[in-house]
Amino acid sequence: MLDLSVIIVTRNTCQLTCAAIESVLSGQDSPSREIILVDNGSTDETPAVVAKRYPSVRQFRSERNLGFARANNLAARAAQGQFLLLLNSDAALQPESLAAAVAWMRAHPDCGAAGVQLLNPDGSPQNSIANFPTLATELLNKSLLRRLCPRRYPGKEHRFTEPVEVETVVGAFMIIRRDLWDAIGGLDERYFFFLEETDFCLQTRRLGKRLMHLPQITVWHGQGQTAKKDSPAARIEYWRSRYIYFAKNHRLSVRLTLAIGLLLRLSANCLASGLLAALTLGRSARWKNKWQVNSALGLWHLRGKPQDMGLPR
């Protein structure tokens, strides 16, 4: 059995995907590993370029977008590694990242999965951990929560220097024990994009396994460059995933409170952003974009949350 299976899901991100693959192949003291790429219906040159440049990469091609969870599950079924690494196509490893992550997991068998410190292209830290979604995190301002209660809601302002147990990690780089993956059954395919790794972290904790943040390992991350191509669609997809997460993991009273609170806030945001966009005569890109996002979310709710709105399938 190989030490590690690196799984990358891509869609129309040829240059980013090649950079991610290059970073895996150029690792120092790398464990035995394989790279599995799932192409989620790319219409650019990604499949052909990867096949030509990296013949050792095992590639699965889909004619349509399977979603993040389903694509990773497809690759995992073919994976031969003792550990699985979910790596975003807009992430790039440091030379020592793979060796350090595998070594840490081997030395700590009580750890089921782990994430690392993600960095922006300029080297500044990204939020690499998060809390499980609750009424507080979803209805209140997250930045304010992090400032008022930094221990309860740590963010990128809190720089950890030692490995620490956390609730969830950002799935741009997430190393997972294969036996844990099999016990949970992989990622829940009801999530098309967003929160699938958060739900996996919750199931990890429920099985009594620790989930760790490893700040000593750093990875470059574009922070959702693929999703940013269609902001209203991405926000709709996030809201859909949030409803799925709460329906699966919270009681009815919490779900109702969430829905009422979100709709009240959305109504206020629609009114405010529409008014400010009008007052600036549409010249403010910020308020124009906010109005487009909020109105799209409002229309999605009015139409009954249809599947044909959101990220393309």
Features from the language model and the residues they span:
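N-proximal low-complexity "stem/linker" segments adjacent to membrane-targeting elements
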Residues: 1-26
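Active-site-adjacent helix/loop segment of glycosyltransferases
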Residues: 7, 206-282
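A conserved acidic beta->alpha catalytic loop
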Residues: 23, 39-48, 64, 94
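Glycine-rich, basic loop-to-helix element that forms the pyrophosphate-binding segment
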Residues: 61-79, 100
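Short aromatic/hydrophobic "clamp" motif used to bind/position activated sugar donors
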Residues: 84
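Conserved donor NDP-sugar-binding/catalytic core segment of glycosyltransferases
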Residues: 92-128
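Short, flexible, basic/aromatic active-site loop/helix in glycosyltransferases
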Residues: 133-167
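A short, conserved alpha-helix in the catalytic core of glycosyltransferases
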Residues: 161, 165-218
